[in-house]
Structure formats: C-alpha cells, structure tokens
A protein has these predicted regions:
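N-terminal Rossmann NAD(P)H-binding glycine-rich loop of SDR-like oxidoreductase domains
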Residues: 3-23
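SDR active-site strand-loop-helix element
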Residues: 6, 30, 65, 86-92, ...
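N-terminal Rossmann-fold cofactor-binding loop
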Residues: 29-35
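NAD(P)H-binding glycine-rich loop region in Rossmannoid oxidoreductase-like domains
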Residues: 36-83, 88, 92-102
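Active-site Tyr-X1-5-Lys
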Residues: 106-131
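Glycine-rich "substrate-gating" loop/helix at the edge of Rossmann-like oxidoreductase active sites
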Residues: 136-143, 164-174, 199
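A conserved pocket-lining segment of Rossmann-fold NAD(P)-dependent short-chain dehydrogenase/reductase
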Residues: 152-172, 184
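Mid/C-terminal beta-alpha module of Rossmann-like enzyme folds, strongest
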Residues: 183-241, 259-262, 266-277
C-alpha cells in the first residue's frame, strides 16, 4: 500500500507521517519546500500540484493536507488503485467566511466550497472513497499562522496583547486532525462525507488568548485591548476580518465525525511545545 501525502511539511502532515509509518504504510511525501528533520524512511518529493516532479505508482491513499483546490485540479489524472481513498482537509472558513466583510475572505470561502464539491464529484466519478474534514483553528506543532505568531511575538517583546472577544472558539490540535484522517483511511468501508471537526472544548476568544499566554515558559505583561482600540484597528483592511470575528462563534459540530471515526479531539490545554518554544 502506498500513500501520497500532499502538504507533508504542513502541521497536519508533520503529525500524519509517523502515524502512517506506524501502520506500515509506504509513504511518498510531497512538499513545496525542502524539509529539515525529515523521517529517513519517507520518500520526499519536492514540488507542487498540479505538476509533479515524476511519475507516481498507483496510490492506495491520497492525503490532502495542502491547498484543496490544487488537489481537486490534480485528482482527475491521479494514478489511483481501484480501492483508493482520498482523505483531505478543507476548513471551517468555508462556512465562517462566507459572508465576511472582506472580499478576499469571501473569495477564500467560495474557493474552498468549490474545491470540496469538485473533489467529491471526481471521487464519485472514479469510484473511490472521499472523506473531507473541515477543521476549526488548528494549532499544536508551532506551524500555524494564528496562535503561534502571538506566542513568538510575546517571546520577543515579553508583551502579550489580549483582545476581548465574546465569540466561542474550538481550537483543534493538528495531531487530532491527523488521527481523524488516518481513521477515515483505515475504516472497513469508505466514508464519503464532509465532516466538521473542531477541538474537544469550546471557550471564548478571550479565554483562548489567555490560555496561550499561560502556556508560555516565560513571564509576559498582559495588555487587554479595549474595544475602542479594536474598532479603530478594524478600519485597516487586513485586520477587519479577524477583529469582526472576535464576537462570532467559530465552532464545529463534532458529532458526526466522532461517531464515524472514533476520534475524540483533546481539550485546549496547550504548552510551550505547541508554539515551538
């Protein structure tokens, strides 16, 4: 059995590779950038979809941990075994940013939903299984672009900004997303489904930022950001979307995923390793 992992150097790919190795699955790992500290028994391919650097053998599993639209564009010509399964991640941004005030975020939502549909149609046409997860905010191995930058900025400045937000958050660990993808791959029967997948705990945005700060291995000065300052900052196009969502619930309903895959994600209790510190 051969598995191709797309986006293998991403945070999900980082967690997925050792899980596949533990199952005795031969792994081809594709990444756009050379990978340091790569497992020695994984064959690394440098490149990006839809163009691959060399011909591939028939694939039993295709794991998509990179851009979903690129996977959807490449899949029609992919070399798949008759019983192949496609396991990929989209994002809850497909839903949460559908009516965002920023045009680029609305475009991202549309691109994700279009790719989800195209992927499902291609898999149905080719007769292979297709499971797509919509994770919430992913963290855990210091490679995310949401919480890790906050932790590392605090490391440099010893100051931690604390935005106040009433909206609920449900951060999910990259390792739990990887476990869910593997569970979908190893099911006795293929699971053709689009599943929401969040962390094991819902908490306010304010609480989430406070826990990130508490996880740091050094002292910081916590600086609450008043709403008036946030409203002023929201005038900047790059900040408008994130600030607007502070009072919105960005959560997932895990019921279907947990029932189908048997993976229960962990609660949000990060430590310094989650930020690569």
């Amino acid at each position: 059995m051969i598995a191709l992992v797309l986006g293998a150097s991403s945070q999900i790919g980082y967690c997925l590779l050792p899980l596949l190795q533990a199952e005795g699955i031969e792994v081809l790992a594709l990444s756009r950038r050379p990978t340091r500290s790569a497992p020695t028994d994984v064959r690394w391919l440098q490149g990006a979809l839809p163009a691959l650097p060399l011909a591939l053998p028939p694939l039993r599993y295709v794991f998509g941990a990179g851009p979903l639209d690129a996977l959807a564009a490449w899949l029609p010509a992919a070399p798949l075994t008759p019983d192949a399964r496609v396991l990929a991640t989209s994002s809850m941004s497909a839903v949460s940013k559908q009516d965002a005030p920023v045009a680029a975020e609305r475009a991202l939502s549309m691109r994700l939903r279009t790719a989800e549909q195209a992927l499902a149609q291609t898999c149905a046409r080719r007769g292979v299984g297709c499971t797509v997860l919509r994770p919430t905010l992913i963290y855990g191995v210091g490679r995310d672009r949401s919480l890790t930058p906050l932790a590392r900025r605090a490391q440099r400045t010893r100051v931690f900004a604390l935005p106040r937000g009433r909206g609920l958050r449900q951060p999910v660990h990259a390792g739990d997303v990887a476990r869910a993808l593997l569970a979908a791959a190893l099911r006795a029967q293929p699971l053709d489904a689009l599943l929401e997948f969040g962390g094991g705990e819902r908490l306010s945005a304010t609480q989430m930022f406070a826990r990130v700060r508490a996880s740091l291995p050094f002292a910081t000065l916590g600086v609450p950001l008043p709403r008036a300052l946030l409203a002023l900052a929201a005038l900047h196009p790059a900040l408008r979307g994130p600030i607007t969502r502070l009072d919105q619930d960005l959560i997932a309903d895990n019921a279907r995923a947990v029932a189908a895959l048997g993976v229960t994600p962990r609660a949000f209790h990060p430590d310094a390793r989650c930020w690569g510190l």
